[in-house]
Every structure is written in C-alpha cells, then in structure tokens.
Amino acid sequence: MKDLLKFLKSQTKNEDFDAIKISLASPDMIRSWSFGEVKKPETINYRTFKPERDGLFCARIFGPVKDYECLCGKYKRLKHRGVICEKCGVEVTQSKVRRERMGHIELSSPTAHIWFLKSLPSRIGLLLDMPLRDIERVLYFESYVVIETGMTNLEKRQILTEEQYLDSLEEFGDEFHATMGAEAIQFLLKDINLVQECNVLRIELNETNSETKRKKLTKRIKLLESFIQSHNKPEWMILNVLPVLPPDLRPLVPLDGGRFATSDLNDLYRRVINRNNRLKRLLDLAAPDIIVRNEKRMLQEAVDALLDNGRRGRAITGSNKRPLKSLADMIKGKQGRFRQNLLGKRVDYSGRSVITVGPYLHLHQCGLPKKMALELFKPFIYGKLEVRGLATTIKAAKKMVEREEAIVWDILDEVIREHPVLLNRAPTLHRLGIQAFEPVLIEGKAIQLHPLVCAAYNADFDGDQMAVHVPLTLESQLEARALMMSTNNILSPANGEPIIVPSQDVVLGLYYMTREKINGKGEGMLLNGSNEAEKVYRLGIAELHSLVKVRIIEYKKNEDKSFTAIKKIIPTTIGRAILWMIIPKGLPFSIVNQTLGKKDISKMLNTCYRILGLKSTVFFADQIMYTGFAYAARSGASVGIDDMVIPEKKANIINEAEIEVAEIQEQFQSGLVTAGERYNKVIDIWAAANERVAKAMMQNLSTESVINKKGYKQKQISFNSIFMMADSGARGSAAQIRQLAGMRGLMAKPDGSIIETPITANFREGLNVLQYFISTHGARKGLADTALKTANSGYLTRRLVDVAQDLVVTQDDCRTHEGILMTPLIEGGDVKEPLRERVLGRVTAENIIIPNTKNILIKRNTLLNEKWCDLLEHNSIDNVKVRSVVNCDTDFGVCAYCYGRDLARGNLVNKGEAIGVIAAQSIGEPGTQLTMRTFHIGGAASRAAAESSIQVKNQGIINLNNAKFVINSAGKTVITSRNVELNIIDNFGRTKESYKVPYGAIMAKGDGEKVHSGETVAKWDPHTMPVITEVNGLVRFVDMIDGQSITRQADELTGLSSIVILDTAERMSSGKDLRPALKIIDCNGNDVLISGTDMPAQYFLPGKAIVQLDDGVQISSGDTLARVPQESGGTKDITGGLPRVADLFEARRPKELAILAEISGIISFGKETKGKRRLVITPVDGSDSYEEMIPKWRQLNVFEGERVDRGDVISDGPESPHDILRLRGVQAVTRYIVNEVQEVYRLQGVKINDKHIEVIIRQMLRKATVVKSRDSDFLEGEQVEFSHIKISNRMLDKKKKMPATFSRDLLGITKASLATESFISAASFQETTRVLTESAVAGKRDELRGLKENVIVGRLIPAGTGYAYHKERLNRRQKKHNNPTVSSSQISAEEASASLSELLNSALIEK
C-alpha cells in the first residue's frame, strides 16, 4: 500500500489537471493518506530535542528531521536513500517530506465534525430532519435518541431525557434501543436510504400546497440528491479517524533562551490525544458509564476546538488568554491561507525606494539607483562575469561584485540594456499601477520617475515610495515590453481618454506660452516660419505674447498615409509659433492657435493619437513636457502676497448683508417669521454675499486695462500669477482663490448643519481666534472622512473584482440581435451626455437607416469609431441600438462584438482580454474621489422641489410620449395619463430637452406644435392632484352623505363652500361601507360610457379629496371634478457618493420603495384592513386579477377605474431594481443601474464608460429561478446559473422536448460572488467555512474557469497571454482523448485528480 501511495504522490506532482473536486473523506481514505498513527501527545524530548517516538513530531511516521539522515544516525548521506533504519524505523529521505506526510489518530469514540453540525443550515440536522438543538443535546450527552423502536409506542429519532429513558426501560425492557453521543447520530445517518427517502419526499412535494413546507422539502431533496450524486455517505460527517497535519506545517521553533514557539495546532492536537488515550483506558477498564460519558463529551469538545475553535461555546484559550488558532482559522480571513499565501505572495528580485522627479527622462525610461540595480541584477552579473572568464566560479564573481570593481559597473550597464523593470506604487487601484520602464542608471538613492506617468500612478513627490520588480524570464520580459511598457498605456482603460496628460508646471508653461498680450513688443511683425519667430524672441526683438503674422506649412494626412503640404499666413503669437515646432506632421495649426489650458492639451493628445497613432503621440507627449517645463521656468510665475488682490467692494457687500440679517432678526423677534425660516434666510443672505464678493474679486483678478497701439485703454486677461495658475488648470480653482482673497464664507458643524455666522475674513487678511476655531471643524472632518473613504472604496473594489473576475472575452461574435437602445442623456433642458459619447466604441446591433429614407447608413456589427460618430451627428440620428455585454449569448465569458472597443487600445477587444477585472478596477479606482456624505436637503434644494411649470430653453417642436389627453372647455390640452414625457425636438429630429409631465397638467401647446425658447408649455398645481373627467355630461353624487362620508367646509376668504370626503378612519360606523364617487350621466339619467370601453364613467374619490361642484351640474371633458391634496413628502436625505454606488451594486431594496403595477389592467379597491388597503388590478382580457395590500399612509398616483400597464408606478418612491427587472425586463434594469451609477460619478467629474457598469450588471444577472421545470432536470423554484438553463434548454429543443421556463434574478455583488460556480473563488472571498462545507457535501467540481481559481492552484490565468496556453492545453487533451495510448504504468487523469481532491479536501494543500 505504501509503495502504491508513494507512486500516486509522485504522479500528482506533474499530472496536468482540469478540475478540482472537493468531497467528504471516508475513514478509509484518511487512513490511506496516513503514514502511521500518532499515539502520544509528546512533541520533542526536552534534553535531546529529538522528536519523541509515536508523538506529534515522530520521525518514523513523518520522515527524517535532517536530509538523508535517520534519527539515530546509523544511516547518513545520499547513498542510503530509501533505506528504512531497523533501529529507529525512520526512512532515509529528504526532510521536506515532513511537509507532506500526514498521520492519523484512531478515535476511541466517534465524534461529529463541527462544520457539518454548526455551519448553518446544519447538514446533519437537515438530513435527519431533526432540530439542531436536539442533535446537540444528543451529541453532548444530555439526552438519548431512539434508534430502534421495536414493538413500542416510541418513535424513531425521538429524544428522551434521562428520566424518560429510565421510565421507558422499565416499561419496555430490551424491546427498544436508545443511546446518546455521536455513535447514535452516526447510526441514524447510516440508516438513511438516500434514494428511497428522496422519492418519498418528491411524492410529498407534489402533494403539499403550503409554501413553507414546500421550501423545506425542496431543501432536503436538494441535499439528498447532492449526497447521491457525489457518492458521499452521510455517516462520513461523523469522524472515526482524525487526520494529523504534517509537522512542518505546525512547526515547533526553538527560541533563544531555551523556550519554544509553537503553532497553536500542536496544543489542540495534544488535548485530543490526551483525552482520546484517557478514554481508551477508561473503556478498557470498563469504567462507570457517567465517567465514560464525560470523557466522550470532552473528546468531542477537543475535536471541535481543533477543527473550528469558538464555533460552539467559549473558545479554548492558550497560556496568554487568547483563543487558539484552529484549522478553520488557518484558511479563513485576510491572514488565512487563501488571501495571505495563495492570492498574494512575496516577490523575489524586488526593491523599493523614494521617488523623485526625472524631467529629462523619455516616457519609456525611469532612473534606477546604481546600488539598487547592482543588487537586483546580481545573478545576471555573476553569469556575465563567468561567461567572459573574468571570474572562475560564482563565489569569485560574488567577491568581485562585493568589492565593486570597475569592470562590474560596465557589465551592469550591459545587463541592464533593454531589460525592462516593473515599477509599482501601492495602492495599485487599476492596472496602470504597475508599468514597465527601461532603467537608466543614476547616482543617488531615489528612483526617478517620468512626470507624465504620475497621473496613472496617482503619485507625487512628497515622499511617496515605489517598488521595483525585475522580470527574469524571456517571456516575462517580452510581456513587460509589449504590454506593460508605459508607452503602450497612453489611454485610460476606464474611459478611453489619454491618461498621459501634462499637469501643473507643464500646463502653466504652455498656457503662458500661448497667451496673447495687447501692444507687446514687436506687435504686427511678419515672420517666415517658427524658426524666425524663435530667433526674434531669443534676440529680444519681440515678446513671447506679441501678436504677429507667421507663414507656416500645415500637413494634411491622406487616406494612403502620405501628407499634403498647405502653406498659410496666420495671425498668431510668437509663443504659439514656437510651440508649432514640436507639433507632429498631420495636425492642423488651429490646434495651437489658442490659449491652451489643461483640457485643450488633453484634446490635442487625443486628436494626435486618433490621427497619427501611438508612436507619434509618445514622442509628442515628451516634447510637450520638455517645452512646458522650459517655458514655465521662463515665465517666472510665483505666488506673492500682493497677487491676492482683495476687492474694494468687499466691505460694502458685507455691511449690506449684516443690515439684512439684522432686519430678519427683528422680524423674528416680533414673531413674523419662524426660527427655521429665519435660519434659512440668514444662510441664503450670506451665501449670496459670498457669491458677490467672489465675483468682484474674480473680475478684479482676471482683467487688467492696458494702453493699446492706438493709445486707447483696453481690457485684457490679466497676467496675475495666481489667476494664471487657476485659469490654465495647473493648480487651484476659483473656490480656493475666493478663500485667499474674497471671504471664506459659511462653515459647517461636524454634524453637517451650517453655522449661520460666516467667516468674513480671508486668508490674506488672516482669521481671528473664533474664525479659526470654526474652520477647524471642517478641516478635521475632511481628514476623518478621507480615512473612512479609503477603506470603504477598497472594499467596494474587492467585491467588484471578485464578482467579475471570471469574465473574459472568449469568442468573436455570439450572433445575437439583442442590444440596448442608446439615446442622448437629457435631464430637463440640458444634454448631460450626447449620443456620440455614449455609442463611441460600441458595435451596432442592427442596420442604421438614414431618417425618412430606406437607405442603410451604417451596417449591423460595425464598430462605431470617431468617423462613424461624425456621420451619425451629420445625419442627426438620435437613437442607436448597440450590442451590449448584458445581452451577450456566449455561455462562458462574452464575445468581442458585444463588448466593442478595447478602450485602452482603441481597436476591437482581443480574445482573452480580462474585461471583468478591468471593469471592476475602472469603477473602483475613482472610489476614493467620491464623497461619503449623505446630502441634507435644505435651502436651494427644497425650493426646487415644488416645480409647477415647464419652461423650454431651445426652440423646436413638442413631442409627447405615451400621452393620453383631452381638450377642456377652454380649448386647452389636459394630460390624463401617467409618466408622460415631453421632448423638444430640433429641425434635424434630435431631442434637445426632455421633461416629465404629471397627470392633470394643462398644456399651452399641443403635440407637434412649435415653441420658442423661454416659452412656458405646461402648468400644474404641485400641491394637489386633480381628478379629471374624460366625458361630457351631468355630475351625479353617489354615496356622498353629509356627516357620514363627507363634510362641507366654507372658505373664509372667498365664502365658497366645498365638500371634503372623509377618510374611512374618520367616519362613523354607519358610513364605513359608503364609497363616495362622482358619476357622469346624460340628460336622460343614463350612464355615460368611457370612450372605447363598456365601463360607465364613475370616479371614486379617495379620502381628503375636495369637490367644488354641486350635484347635477353640467361638465365637459377635461374639467376638474375634484382635487386630492398631495402631502409634500418631508425632506428626505439623498444618499450620495460611495454609499450610493455600493447600494446600487448590492441591489439593495430602498426603504419606502415605489409600488409598481404587477400586471396591466383596471384598478379597483377591495376590502380594507386596519392599516392597509387592498389594491386589485383586473386585466382587460378576463384573466386572473392581482391583489396587493398597500399601507394606508402611502400616497397613490392612481384612482379607481383607471387603466395601468405592467410596471407603471402606483405609488411614488425610489424604485427597487428587483421590481424593475421583474416587471420591465433586463433592458430597463440595466438602464436604471447604469444611469444611477453614472449620476454619482458625473457629480464628481469622473468619466467612466457605460460598458464597465454593464459588465458588472451581467454578473449580477448570472442566476435565474426555474418557474416550470417541464422536461428538464431542474427543481421548480431552484436558483440556477443562467448559462446552465440556456445550455439545458438548447439540448431539450434539439430533442424536441419542453424546455424549462425561468425568471432572471438580480443578485447583489457580494451574493453573486458567493453564488459563483467555482467554490475556490467563493471560499477565498468571504464566509470560507460555509462555502467549503456546502461544496464538500455536494461533492462540487471546480472547472477552474475564472482567474482567481487558477491563481490559487498556481497556474497561468485563462486571460491575456495565458489564454493561448490554456487553449493549447485543452487541444492537447482533446487529442489525447481522441487517440488514447495509455501504458499500464501511467495513471489516468481522473485518478490523479481524485487523489488531488483528497489532498485538497482536507484543506492541506499548502502551496
């Protein structure tokens, strides 16, 4: 057996495996792993320090302590390899076998495995169908359980207390059998006939109707089936044999001073062995039952503590009062095996140092200190020295390097040439946090970094440190050069815009260089080309900013990549002409003929990349940087105290504000305004004053008046240093300048409320003590916020990466016709994001037709690049259906067409690109820039809430979407449908503005009419909701009895009387069943029918409705019958920033969410209960109606008798994404989440491409619930991977069988990560114990599809360059399968993977 095992173990080393299976280990399997039984609790001998025989470190069981040397020293050296010493019984072999050889302990009494007992839901409990409490009482020897009933009235699995047991013994004698402890449970588990039980339960499931019972049965059936399929036996959840971890994985290390440091596991094992031996002795002595029982209970507790300390009862503590670390603690958590050693490892050949600026470097270079390079590249240097024959041995080479001989430096230069190194700055938030550079040797001890890559690293030079890594193999060097070189990462993968963008000094230099100055020296000169411009500037004949005319040559790039020269004479400035020298051929002069700010420079680089490609852009970026630095130095811009000019008007403005505040205070004291109003008004006054001061200050700073050539005064933009820095985008902002030279303004208290006394001083004047104290609040809160934000943002990124890590581009085209309809994002009168930006880089899902014709403009499956987008704009197309990851039909992964352009490269995405991780990084990386706070609505926000009209901004044509309306007696259009959209469309058919119009709004202009800008097109009363009639006739009151269902009120001011409907709660008992309504009848007293239906026009009135009509009056369609007052929903705080993004991705249901109509039909109300009313929707086609209970305090948007469509809003509130998915489908929920997430990022000015969010949504929609299983193998109500249902249904379709029906589920990212197919990935994310328990019972197989699983098992990931490797591997396996030539000495892959799964199963694979 031993030899066979050795053979097996040597095989698993090199055997290539495809999947990993985890299952329960049988006692025989545990014994087969073992090399001997551990019988004694001793570890090592205190005198000789040699392991004790049969102890926890026994050399005979686990192998020799020293390489090739037995314990007694009889056999030493390699020549005795494989000999077993007859004296000490130790095999002569390498000592590293002590890391892999296991032992075992034969338990004298079975013990339950705590994971299967206590990890909820308890597997043992579910199998036996007994409550966990009862099982625990049996296991810990408090009660008996009946095993054999015999001819008694006891039931099997019945729990008996000590008394009941003794009574039954007296009554029935030996007829029945009841015991306690793990033996009893083991017996019961053995007794289960899985298949038979399963069939019984299935029959029961079909017969029951109770929902809870069905759920419980389904759970049991699933568990039983998983046991049947995985060939696990239930009794294996009870241990008879305990495996012992190899000793080198729980080491005992001698410390100085004769003490030992030991792993906690040794203590835990010692307790188990001690108790086990004692129990053995007691059983041999046939000790009294009560003593044996106690000992068995203690053994059970010791085993529990070893497996998972602290899961049951108090954790066992060591000598220093801290809980001992059990086996379960070894693998879970941040310090556990998964996250500490398998997903992240320490790296050899690396160093770290402080970074400084390298302004003279090229973009692909970094400065590496000589000392560091020498250390990092040592092996290469040794090798070179030996090859050259300069050193005879490695030892000699080592000496030479240590002495730092001159020749060593020459060789270092050679070694380093074209050998890229990787630079990494922590935290690595996205893939640009590690880039490759070619090292340049420098003196000093700091790494030099190229300034343009700082943005990608988020680095600055205030003491940041960076790590250097050396790629050793040729392949890794190739990857570093081809994929990770900084010159290949010009565009950001998050939004496809350049990330190599100059900032700060460079921007200031270029801004200064391209500014104009009126009447500068040399104005009006005519110059021939840039060289002459530079000459006159250098000679001092002309100033940098003077306006001159220059003759330049522009080059236009043709289709065939050649250039056409165009000569022009252009009015410009000297500086711009000089800058033109570095602009690459193919860009127009207009690009520099403007004052360049940061945005313009970014645009310039982007244009360059799109027109001229990567190489030119890299060269251009370097030139921009050198020029910018040079001219920033020439500009001599600096910050002096006199640059901060305080406006003269400031004192007046503040005085006026103080007078206004005093007035309000008087009004408050005389009781004209409330405290709240006073506070709000005071804050508004100061906010306005602050704005005025800021405006005056900016006017002052930004312009200066100069004398022009003709001798007149003229205003020009100022050359004030502080203004230039802010205006160019180099540093600072108007808000900061305002605090320097204006006034600091209002400050907030720590709880977010605003302090009403503002700081009127600015930093130039200086703050007094009180003002300084007030401003410390904000500063401190900012620091605390930042710390919290970093942690939260990091956790969000981790969850996102985990949910999306296995999403890789796996095929070119999945051929789906599905897609998302993209429209420009319009809110109110503003286009927030034009269509062009939303579809750029996507693939069209269907042909795009030129409007009003049948001609195809763009074919299906075209990647929309900049040129196509220009075409779209030219033809004024305002909606495009594009392919999306959410609709992709690929089973595992996505296809390239559904993803579209790889944003970091600008072409169609390649196969093997890990788009999931890229998406997660793009969303998580800006997380630290988002705010943490929830916004409190006050001041401005509450005023905007009560909108009552729509005023358009652009002229155009009105277009009403899904609108129903009637014309009232005044000839105006009245809206009678919900969720109406009003769009303003320009002459080209493009939507310019979009508004929501409420029910009952009166339109000034109708559908299709022209409007001018500033015109008001719709009005409504924001405080009441009208009930509008759609027919003409006479009003008839129904059930409106004074004092019972209505009361009459007279208005004090007008004297008009009105009728108010009483709420049911306020009515007397006699009026409870009355249902007040207004009926419309014709002059003969017959009911008027609503047009197009056979329903009488009857309008039921809700409580609190106000009617201002009399019985029998004539009314016409569009008139208001009654008004229902709308309570203004009190101010709610909106969650913003990071928490909002987390809520959306976790798919949390909001509080007080909107109620949506589940089906289409007619609304009516059924019988009410105390706090709820019953809403009934009856479909028009006569199918089953739908009922829902709604709390009475909810405001409803619908009246009785109204028609709603599925998914319409019945009661307002934040919508739940789950409802949107269920009622409106995948498209709608995608649109909702994308827009909501983008809203948060847009507020912070962060650009993220929509497709990244869609990638995460695809992963959230991974699961589906089976509605009807039909001919498939699924259970009804079971949650299954969507891809499995798709594959299964395809198979059933082929066989002409009935496929399963299903509904898609939306899971939050945490849930989705834990519900993934791969148990390795789930276990390494969170809740390790639960995941492993579940997987072991079900005998799960991990196909190793994702990236994480492959990293953990130590393989290349199936993405990027590893994608090809895995493909090749699969092909090889296919070939092997097709023509198997297995010799008898080989073992099959199945056996090998089985033995591997056994190793893994006991959580023992260390590396």
UniProtKB/Swiss-Prot annotation:
The keyword Transcription applies. Zn(2+) 1 binds at C70, C72, C85, C88. Transmembrane segments: none annotated. Binds 1 Mg(2+) ion per subunit. It catalyses: RNA(n) + a ribonucleoside 5'-triphosphate = RNA(n+1) + diphosphate. InterPro entries: DNA-dir_RpoC_beta_prime, DNA-dir_RpoC_beta_prime_bact, RNA_pol_asu, RNA_pol_N, RNA_pol_Rpb1_1, RNA_pol_Rpb1_3, RNA_pol_Rpb1_3_sf, RNA_pol_Rpb1_4. Belongs to the RNA polymerase beta' chain family. DNA-dependent RNA polymerase catalyzes the transcription of DNA into RNA using the four ribonucleoside triphosphates as substrates. This is DNA-directed RNA polymerase subunit beta'. It comes from Buchnera aphidicola subsp. Acyrthosiphon pisum (strain APS) (Acyrthosiphon pisum symbiotic bacterium). The gene is rpoC.
